[in-house]
Amino acid sequence: MGRTLYDKIFDEHVVHTEEDGTAVLYIDRHLVHEVTSPQAFEGLREAGRKVWRVSSIVATADHNTPTTGWERGYDGIADPISKEQIVTLDKNIQESGAAAFFPFLSKRQGIVHVIGPENGATLPGMTVVCGDSHTSTHGAFGALAHGIGTSEVEHVMATQTLLAKKAKNMLVQVNGKVAPGITAKDIVLAIIGKIGTAGGTGYTIEFAGEAIRDLSMEGRMTVCNMAIEAGARAGLVAVDDKTINYVKGRPLAPTGVEWDQAVAYWKTLHSDADAKFDAVVELNAAEIVPQVTWGTSPEMVLGIDAVVPDPDKEKDPSKRGAIERALTYMGLQPGKPMDDIFVDKVFIGSCTNSRIEDMREAAAVVKKLGQKVAKNIKLAMVVPGSGLVKEQAEREGLDAIFKAAGFEWREPGCSMCLAMNADRLEPGERCASTSNRNFEGRQGAGGRTHLVSPAMAAAAAIHGHFVDIRQFA
């Protein structure tokens, strides 16, 4: 019987299997940042161990890095704990070594899930881990990638392996072509809206179908990034020419004979025609409209042409209660049109949507509308995902488009995706955000988050409320 893409990668990395089915899995790439690594390095020191395979580590600072005040250097990091974590990462990597390290203030520094792929650290067929739940991003390359906890970070550093039980296989097939103006973010939000945030629990999801194949590598990264929000630990897309062309020539990619050998292997990284999946979900791409979350979970999402749901119409008591709690927190009334929801702040960035194509997508909307940020918008900020993205955007003049319209153009970092740095919402503030989580307090205590695509966020900044981006496509 044929094997799925997940089966192939998992099986080829099994070092040993216990009687209960637990596998010792070899890890090819370990991505490290400043938040989940300090305890791991300290644990190694206390045990008298060293990093087993230094060449597997690629490190950067991202969660705590400020997006302003870089001219002040490390003194620009206002929070002492944030500063300590960033300084500690510098010291730990200097002591242990790494295949590549992109420290705070360096040209290639950025969000770990942006700098990994752009530097060729993420390759097809790899097992990739990081102490961050959105490591699933790297599955876009046909790599088995998922987040791990701090104790597991130390385990991988010490042994280059991880204990894992094999997941079930789910195929999410998005058939046909999307309408103009529909993006990867809309696709993945529609998927989550269909299967729910627990739909992928216990599975690894392979994303397939014409609409997925049509996506660029950056679009595929957006989809795989949010596989975790569908309950899956990992998401995958089969390798094709787009994958190989993206990787070619990047700093950490193989070269010469090794490149040729790698490509030959990479071309086998797809599910066999007769592979069996434990679950199959299908979506019609033509039916996907611009998506906006209304509640406090990514599954609480609707099309821009819908209205806020009425809990009284929900028969399931637990679901009805969840809707009521979400509406109370979000300050929304049932029946309110989604395009009548006004926002206070706009955030374009995060490991979901901060790559150069996201910048172009948002800038194109701003340029087409030709107007300033709406007066009710307190802050509209654009945060590129890495120094290289920022540099490329500035070469293309995208920063000038944003700044002329009244957006703030920031330095790279995780920024307002999470309330771990200076960029955050105040209680009661409503944000159109291109990030991946709209949980209570995610962007700041009492903050209200609506997840959207970069184009939808840009349009909301100009209009002051959500609008149907298809009219500008």
From Swiss-Prot:
It comes from the Bacteria. Pfam families: Aconitase. It catalyses: (2R,3S)-3-isopropylmalate = (2S)-2-isopropylmalate. InterPro entries: 3-IsopropMal_deHydase_lsu, Acnase/IPM_dHydase_lsu_aba_1/3, Acoase/IPM_deHydtase_lsu_aba, Aconitase_4Fe-4S_BS, Aconitase_4Fe-4S_dom, IPM_dehydratase_rel_enz, IPMI_cat. Catalyzes the isomerization between 2-isopropylmalate and 3-isopropylmalate, via the formation of 2-isopropylmaleate. Belongs to the aconitase/IPM isomerase family. LeuC type 1 subfamily. This is 3-isopropylmalate dehydratase large subunit.
